[in-house]
Amino acid sequence: TEIEKPAYPVIDFHMHMGKMLLGESYETKYDTKEYVRELQDAGVVCAVNMDGYFGKDLEKMQKKQEGFEEMFFNFMQLDFSAYDDPDFCDKTKKVIEDSCMRGCRGIKLWKDLSLWERDKYGRPIRTDDPRFDIFYDTAAKLHIPVLMHVADPAAFFTPKSEKNERWEELDVCPEWDFSDHEKYMSFEELMEMQENTVRSHP
């Protein structure tokens, strides 16, 4: 049976409208009105955009969404490049508050935080870092969710071989291979980190 319309209104909870996948010139790559029409034709009543970012990037995204503010909910992203600065926590807290005031509905933390981001000593930046408590507490105070992408499929953390169930994916995308545990945290470590984070901030 061909189903042309969903039985219920659809909320697309994970979409990308901006530079993360489309590059800095994303605003020239699609027409927002046409995009909304296609979403509505598919039964989508609203969508959560993970490319809200903050500051001027957020302003740029909101301009791209003008006229369709009720259709899109933006989640902000945070910048960890100044992680080692003494005022990093205070500045990031202000970014969260400002982005929320400008309309962001949540925070998105990407897997690069613990897989690629490093402090000045070369150690992975962890989501259960006590310094991050202020971010989670601020989000709770503002009544916005924190969406975390922690790790990837467990097979990405084991060596690529004929016994690896994701061998074909790893062959096509070798950058998804996190099996070097001298370079990356193990899958088990990442899961423990996630449990610690949720336990501390239910």
Please provide the spans of the model-predicted regions:
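An N-terminally biased module of ancient metal coordination in phosphate/nucleic-acid-related enzymes
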Residues: T1-G67, D90
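A short helix-to-beta-strand connector/capping loop
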Residues: P6-A7, E70-M71, P202
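Single, functionally critical "micro-switch" positions that shape active/binding sites
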Residues: I11-F13, M148, P202
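A conditional alpha-helix N-cap/helix-loop micro-motif detector
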Residues: S25-K29, F54, D85-C89, I125-D129, ...
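Short Gly/charged-rich anion-binding patches and loops
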Residues: E34, K94, I134, E192-M193
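Generic structural signal for hydrophobic
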Residues: E38-L39, S99, A139, T197
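Active-site gating/metal-coordination segments in enzymes
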Residues: L58-E182
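Conserved N-terminal glycine/acidic-rich loop preference
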Residues: C173, H181-H201
